[in-house]
Regions:
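Nucleotide-sugar-dependent glycosyltransferase catalytic domains
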Residues: 1-161, 165-188
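Short acidic active-site motifs
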Residues: 22, 215-216
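Short coil/turn linker and secondary-structure boundary residues
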Residues: 100-103, 197, 215
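Catalytic donor nucleotide-activated moiety binding site of glycosyltransferases and closely related
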Residues: 167, 177-213
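Short acidic alpha-helix that forms the nucleotide-activated donor recognition element
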Residues: 216-223
């Protein structure tokens, strides 16, 4: 049915449409010199095009160019898929209303800003040597993140495994029984970050596994 590849472009476009008018109304009264935004926040691109100011994109993940395409994973959806058609209609309406580029699937995931800051080490990016001077690889920018407290691994000398499903696609309760079965008999410590999953909903948590929702990730990773 297309699944994620069909849904994500539509969701990005729909989200942009929810607030782009408010953004433009605000910026028209105090026109900025440039617009800086996350590469997935396509309202930033729409606004920069509409106001005719430089578009500065921030990448906390992999950027694309002619030799490496993020969009490729989203393009193999039939053109007559309902969500692909809905996305195309939104993109066309934005181009007509705001005078912006046509936000195709290719443009959403592989489009560039006039200047691009990539928060990764250059050598971790596929084909990094093929990116031009409009891309600057700053390396990872990490704050102290003290809001979630601190954490110490059990003092038993065993290796520590940290499990986290990440930021975007993490509502997967079926994952945790699979994890628990995989690590139950291993002589290691495990910390599983749950995000929105209620710890009380999980059954038969192994003795070597600790779970938490909002966790001090940097503390855990440092150990």
């Amino acid at each position: 049915d297309g699944g994620v590849a069909a849904a994500v472009p539509f969701l990005f476009l729909n989200e942009a449409g929810a607030y782009i008018d408010t953004v433009l109304d605000t910026l028209k009264n105090d026109k900025p010199d440039a617009i800086v935004h996350d590469f997935a926040g396509i309202a930033g691109t729409i606004a920069a095009d509409s106001l005719k100011v430089p578009n500065v994109m921030l990448y906390t993940s992999y950027p694309s160019n002619a030799s490496y395409s993020v969009a490729a994973g989203f393009e193999n959806v039939p053109a007559d898929h309902p969500l692909r058609q809905a996305a195309a209609q939104l993109a066309q309406s934005y181009a007509e209303k705001y005078g912006c580029r046509l936000m195709t699937v290719k443009e959403i995931f592989d489009g560039h800003g006039d200047f691009n800051l990539v928060m990764m080490q250059k050598k971790l990016v596929p084909n990094y040597e093929t990116f031009d001077d409009s891309f600057v690889f700053t390396g990872v920018q990490i704050g102290k993140r003290t809001a979630f407290g601190s954490w110490k691994a059990p003092d038993n000398g065993k290796p520590l495994l940290y499990s986290s499903l990440g930021t975007a696609f993490n509502n997967w309760p079926e994952y945790y029984p699979i994890l628990f079965d995989a690590v139950r008999d291993l002589d290691i410590n495990v910390f599983a970050a749950l995000g929105s999953i209620d710890p009380a909903s999980l059954k038969d948590i192994p003795a070597n596994v600790e779970v938490g929702q909002m966790v001090p990730q940097l503390d855990i990773l440092s150990q």
